[in-house]
């Protein structure tokens, strides 16, 4: 494995996240909780494994496309919980397209996670839900295409 270069690695990871990644707040219905998550999915296994080597996530998953056989299979890397917040703090200075999402993402009150047998206060639950909704509102999916041209 190549020697790590923290500043360069964070800049490269930010570029990958800007182009192939997603930041979201996942809602777990089973225990009525929210947690932050960062995902990258792409066809290039080596790049996904590189992320896993430098920022160990949950795991690298192989994702098949059974519905459309013309689509390539992909590989997915993701981190969640406090690891996702740590990753975003590291790449934030280098983000471009997802910078606003990342800044909102970092407002997630993870330090207030309940321990065994304790529940979150309604105030924290509402704050987490609000951040999830705001983050969803920043996504461009489904908002139509913005077409522009420029004279060169």
Identify the residue ranges that each predicted region occupies.
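Internal intein/HINT superfamily modules and their associated LAGLIDADG
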Residues: 1-152
């Amino acid at each position: 494995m190549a020697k790590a270069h923290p500043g360069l690695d964070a800049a490269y990871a930010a570029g990958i996240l800007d182009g192939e990644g997603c930041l979201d707040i996942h809602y777990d219905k089973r225990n009525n909780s929210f947690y932050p998550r960062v995902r990258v999915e792409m066809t290039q296994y080596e790049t996904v494994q590189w992320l896993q080597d430098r920022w160990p996530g949950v795991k690298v998953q192989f994702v098949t496309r059974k519905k459309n056989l013309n689509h390539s299979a992909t590989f997915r890397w993701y981190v969640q919980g406090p690891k996702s917040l740590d990753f975003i703090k590291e790449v934030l200075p280098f983000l471009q397209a997802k910078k606003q999402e990342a800044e909102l993402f970092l407002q997630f009150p993870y330090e207030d996670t309940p321990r065994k047998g304790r529940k979150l206060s309604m105030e924290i639950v509402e704050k987490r839900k609000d951040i999830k909704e705001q983050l969803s509102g920043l996504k461009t999916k489904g908002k139509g295409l913005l077409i522009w041209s420029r004279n060169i």
